[in-house]
C-alpha cells in the first residue's frame, strides 16, 4: 500500500498530468532501520511491432509506440536489499513524497531530496549513488 499525504494512494488518485512520483521506503532489515529514496513513473512508452495486416503502405514503419501503465502498486524499489526483504515477508512502509508532471521534474526532485537527506553519507539509507555520478562514501 502506498501512502500519499497521510492517505492510501489508489490508481484513481493518479493526476491526469502526472508523470511519476518520488518515494521513500522504510523498513527494519536484520534489526536495522533502513530507508531508500527513489522515483517511479506512472506510465512507460512501449514500442510494439505491427502485424503484417496492420502495416501501412510505407513499409519502413514497423513499430508503433503506446503508453503502458506501470504496476507501481506492486513495486518494492530497485534496491536489492528491499526486494529481498519484501520476499522474506518484511513489512516495508512505502510513501509517495511528491508527484511530478514531467521527466525533468522527476529527476530534479529525486536528486534534490537525495542530497537534502544526505543519502550517501548516512548508513541508514540504502542509496548507493545519485544520478550515477556521485557514489556512496561510507
Predicted regions span which residues?
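Intrinsically disordered, low-complexity segments enriched in small/polar residues
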Residues: 2, 7, 21, 34, ...
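Conserved short loop/helix modules at catalytic or binding sites
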Residues: 40-103
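Boundary/linker segments flanking structured domains
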Residues: 1-17, 92, 97-138
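Glycine-centered flexibility motif
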Residues: 31, 40-41, 78-79, 127-134
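GIY-YIG nuclease catalytic motif and its immediate N-terminal context
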Residues: 1-49, 138
Amino acid at each position: 500500500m502506498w501512502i500519499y499525504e497521510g492517505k492510501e494512494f489508489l490508481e484513481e488518485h493518479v493526476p491526469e498530468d502526472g508523470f511519476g512520483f518520488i518515494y521513500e521506503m522504510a523498513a527494519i532489515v536484520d534489526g536495522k532501520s533502513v530507508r531508500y529514496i527513489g522515483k517511479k513513473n506512472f506510465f512507460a512508452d512501449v514500442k510494439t511491432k505491427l502485424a503484417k495486416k496492420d502495416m501501412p503502405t510505407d513499409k519502413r514503419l514497423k513499430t508503433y509506440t503506446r503508453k503502458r501503465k506501470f504496476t507501481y502498486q506492486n513495486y518494492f524499489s530497485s534496491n536489492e536489499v528491499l526486494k529481498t526483504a519484501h520476499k522474506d515477508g518484511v513489512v516495508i512502509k512505502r510513501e509517495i513524497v511528491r508527484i511530478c508532471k514531467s521527466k525533468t521534474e522527476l529527476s530534479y526532485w529525486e536528486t534534490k531530496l537525495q542530497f537534502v537527506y544526505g543519502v550517501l553519507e548516512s548508513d541508514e539509507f540504502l542509496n548507493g549513488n545519485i544520478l550515477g555520478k556521485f557514489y556512496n562514501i561510507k
